């Protein structure tokens, strides 16, 4: 498995390109901005799908352009369809260069599997930041693409459209307790981390794990 993490746009969304070395197939996850940078990252692969961890515009801002270029299915949880063309803040779509986002071709939910050659991502429905946020977990290689659920030393916001603090706490606790401590966590913004590091040092973890 090859993973390229490309920070895109003015708020540095982590777009991930995940490829299978044998087949040369790849998926694009959270293409929020700067389609040109993403195209450069996938130039040696055959793109077979586009996935959004959730529907906030900074994570889906280039889905429309890339779907048109590659003619591949777009995967997202349907609970976030109401968000995909919501600016959040006035002028934000223009600020990040977002284009209109289509509705998902494939509606993903808990327990689904997204395959890219030999790579298998299990879908974990982890609401709270948004109703439909889904993490993608590659069990064999212990990699979690967490979207905006969990960050290094922090957690996702719950005060944006679709946010729910009660659900967020449940979802963060779930990944911190169910996944192996050496799981690599690729966050929706900022640096990568591990489940073990967040269990030990994330200031939100103590309350969640001991409460």
From Swiss-Prot:
Top EC class, one word: hydrolase
KW Protease (keyword) present: no
Binding-site positions, Zn(2+) 1: 54, 56, 129, 148
Pfam families documented for this protein: Lactamase_B
Co-factor binding comment: Binds 2 Zn(2+) ions per subunit.
Keywords, comma-separated and alphabetical: Hydrolase, Metal-binding, Zinc
GO terms, molecular function: hydrolase activity; metal ion binding
UniProt-listed InterPro entries: MBL_Glyoxalase_II, Metallo-B-lactamas, RibonucZ/Hydroxyglut_hydro
Signal peptide (from-to): none
Gene3D superfamilies: Ribonuclease Z/Hydroxyacylglutathione hydrolase-like
Family: Belongs to the metallo-beta-lactamase superfamily. Glyoxalase II family.
Name assigned to this protein: Uncharacterized protein aq_2135
Organism encoding this protein: Aquifex aeolicus (strain VF5)
């Amino acid at each position: 498995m090859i993973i390229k993490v490309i920070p895109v746009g003015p708020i540095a969304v982590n777009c991930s390109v995940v490829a299978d070395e044998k087949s040369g197939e790849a998926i694009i996850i959270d293409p929020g901005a700067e389609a040109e940078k993403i195209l450069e990252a996938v130039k040696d692969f055959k793109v077979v799908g586009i996935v959004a961890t959730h529907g906030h515009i900074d994570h889906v801002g280039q889905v429309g352009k890339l779907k048109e270029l590659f003619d591949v299915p777009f995967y997202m949880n349907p609970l976030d369809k109401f968000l995909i063309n919501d600016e959040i803040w006035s002028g934000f779509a223009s600020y990040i260069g977002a284009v209109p986002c289509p509705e998902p071709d494939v509606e993903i939910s808990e327990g689904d599997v997204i395959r890219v050659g030999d790579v298998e991502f299990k879908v974990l429905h982890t609401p709270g930041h948004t109703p439909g946020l889904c993490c993608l977990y590659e069990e064999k290689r212990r990699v979690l693409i967490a979207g905006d659920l969990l960050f290094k030393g922090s957690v996702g916001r719950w005060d944006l459209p679709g946010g729910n603090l009660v659900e967020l706490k449940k979802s963060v606790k779930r990944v911190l307790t169910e996944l192996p401590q050496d799981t690599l966590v690729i966050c929706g913004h900022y640096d990568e981390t591990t489940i073990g590091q967040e269990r030990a040092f994330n200031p939100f973890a103590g309350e969640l794990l001991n409460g």
